[in-house]
Amino acid sequence: NLYQFKNMIHCTVPSRPWWHFADYGCYCGR
């Protein structure tokens, strides 16, 4: 779904602070 897709983008292109990754539960490697 779109949510998972956004997570993939956030993981591939870290354009947000690290705390945003933790918020998404998608910290490149999880």
Swiss-Prot record:
Superkingdom of source: Eukaryota
Designated name of the protein: Basic phospholipase A2 CM-I
Catalytic activity: a 1,2-diacyl-sn-glycero-3-phosphocholine + H2O = a 1-acyl-sn-glycero-3-phosphocholine + a fatty acid + H(+)
EC number: 3.1.1.4
SUPFAM superfamilies, per the entry: Phospholipase A2, PLA2
Lineage of source species: Eukaryota, Metazoa, Chordata, Craniata, Vertebrata
Cofactor field: Ca(2+)
Primary subcellular site in the record, as a coarse category: secreted
GO biological process terms on file: arachidonate secretion; lipid catabolic process; phospholipid metabolic process
Source species: Naja nigricollis
Family that this chain belongs to: Belongs to the phospholipase A2 family. Group I subfamily.
Localization: Secreted
UniProt tissue specificity: Expressed by the venom gland.
